Amino acid sequence: MAAAPLLLLLLLVPVPLLPLLAQGPGGALGNRHAVYWNSSNQHLRREGYTVQVNVNDYLDIYCPHYNSSGVGPGAGPGPGGGAEQYVLYMVSRNGYRTCNASQGFKRWECNRPHAPHSPIKFSEKFQRYSAFSLGYEFHAGHEYYYISTPTHNLHWKCLRMKVFVCCASTSHSGEKPVPTLPQFTMGPNVKINVLEDFEGENPQVPKLEKSISGTSPKREHLPLAVGIAFFLMTFLAS
């Protein structure tokens, strides 16, 4: 019975609005980018690997995963054997170059390599504003850095990745950025001229378009039309 009010509400919502409701408060659906975080991913083992995303995109990090035999798709045992387990950090640029986790904070922990059915996945949404107090906010035109440290085998190499959030609006150096105002929004320096400022000129005042379905009588002519109709009814009745 609890689903009945929700179903009734959905039936009352116009069909063109349903895609907008599905997009959520951000107003746009983002793409998803997948990265398999393990030592067999050669991209993560070299400096400079960059994933480019847009605002509202998602980055899905898949942790190392093994089946009961110790071998999993896309993630073989690391150097020295054993299941790979990592702690992922978001760090500064220098922390990325030196693979120093102390210059950042812990983001996720891949500590379940034998999870049933599928690997553990963490998702990062590159949103401009976060609705959560602990949520991270990202800015267009900036780079963000992720590294990992092994929790068991210290001989595993540093894995790292750089994420670039596209794209920042270009502006000349030294100039203050001009905010983009919504349509029909006036800035603080806009002067509004009243009719007295035109001194005899005939300002172009926008007119309302007539209804396509037909025209309606003017309000001031309505009493006259009612009087004529009443007179005709009285005359015909007599």
Curated annotation (Swiss-Prot):
Coiled coil: none
Positions glycosylated per UniProt: N38, N67, N100
Expressed in which tissues: Expressed in brain, skeletal muscle, spleen, thymus, prostate, testis, ovary, small intestine, and peripheral blood leukocytes.
Residue ranges the record assigns to the propeptide: 215-238
Subcellular localization: Cell membrane
Residues making up the signal peptide according to the UniProt record: 1-22
Disulfide-bond pairs as recorded: C63-C110, C99-C158
Domain Ephrin RBD: 30-169
One BP term from GO: positive regulation of amyloid precursor protein catabolic process
CC per GO annotation: plasma membrane; side of membrane
Domain of life: Eukaryota
Entry keyword set: Cell membrane, Disulfide bond, Glycoprotein, GPI-anchor, Lipoprotein, Membrane, Signal
Membrane topology classification: Lipid-anchor; GPI-anchor
Record note on quaternary structure: Interacts with EPHA8; activates EPHA8.
Family: Belongs to the ephrin family.
Protein's job: Cell surface GPI-bound ligand for Eph receptors, a family of receptor tyrosine kinases which are crucial for migration, repulsion and adhesion during neuronal, vascular and epithelial development. Binds promiscuously Eph receptors residing on adjacent cells, leading to contact-dependent bidirectional signaling into neighboring cells. The signaling pathway downstream of the receptor is referred to as forward signaling while the signaling pathway downstream of the ephrin ligand is referred to as reverse signaling.
Designated name of the protein: Ephrin-A3
Organism: Homo sapiens (Human)
Gene name of the record: EFNA3
